[in-house]
Amino acid sequence: MYLPIFTTHSLSEGNPQVTRGLIIVHGANRNADDYFKRGFQAAAAVGHQEATVVVAPHFQTSSDNPASDELFWSSSGWKRGHLSSTEGPRPRRSSYSAIDQIIDLLSDPSHFPALTEITMTGHSAGGQVAHRYAATSRAEKNLGPVTMRYVVANPSTYLYIRQERENTGAFVVPDASVCSDYDDWHYGLSERNTYAGALVVDTIKAQLVRRDVRILIGDADSLSASLDVSCGANLQGPYRFSRGRRLMRFMDQFFPEHSHKEMVVPNVGHSSSGMYLSAIGLDALFGT
């Protein structure tokens, strides 16, 4: 690997007893160690700690003082799948390609022969990663019999795969003269970066529609702390819970065959532990 990871098992050596992989992505604070603990706590809460390999990648920025051989990203770039910094090692890599590599290792039967399912999740900024990665990942084509799900928890924004946004109860195309970049990557599919741009739009749409995506939102997540309030973000709704509900209405209207599932955690706000360790959160991660 070309970035630090926290993991319960060696990915290169594997483990014949492991049946499930849980990849958990940190938020804007990049506290991968805390998210690693959250993932392990969640697995233990349902009695799966022995059979689950928990992996928490650490997407570093320059402020993390990365080692000379470790890639790092801008504070927004890692969330969006951008290439690593030009000031770091070469070749530059997308943050999303790091997740591809983790999935490739987990799904390799010579490493984890009993593994049958991988869950990729993130909360807040990590939730942004999870939703956009679900749309653009190429790793699923190499999974064989291993199934994949994505749990998107309380992100600030989502990826929209059409130009319409909800306005006063109806989906319309916004006035681009007022918000010219509202449909650019990472809000939409225009001006995609290197990783997302390697796929044509129709492929991205098809992947996001058919993949198993759980939209995990806390109904008390209505504050503006660390919320993206750019015009492109505000066109998705006033706060995180509202934005999640709108995204689901968007998918229902334009892609009724979608495989997104809305899962609302009552009385929980912007808390990764509150979300993941709730009954609904555990079901999103480990249920059917």
Cite the ranges covered by each PLM segment:
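A short loop-to-beta-strand scaffold at the N-terminal edge of the catalytic core in hydrolase folds
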Residues: M1-E13, R20-G21, A98
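Short beta-strand element of the alpha/beta-hydrolase
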Residues: P16-A28
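Active-site machinery of serine-nucleophile hydrolases
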Residues: A28-L105, T147-S156, I161, M248-P256, ...
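Gly/Ala-rich beta-loop-alpha elbow adjacent to hydrolase catalytic centers
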Residues: G122-G126, A130
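Conserved hydrolase catalytic core segment
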Residues: R132-M148
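The feature captures the conserved acid-bearing segment of alpha/beta-hydrolase catalytic domains
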Residues: P145-Q253
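C-terminal catalytic histidine-bearing segment of alpha/beta-hydrolase fold enzymes
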Residues: L216, D228-V229, R245-T288
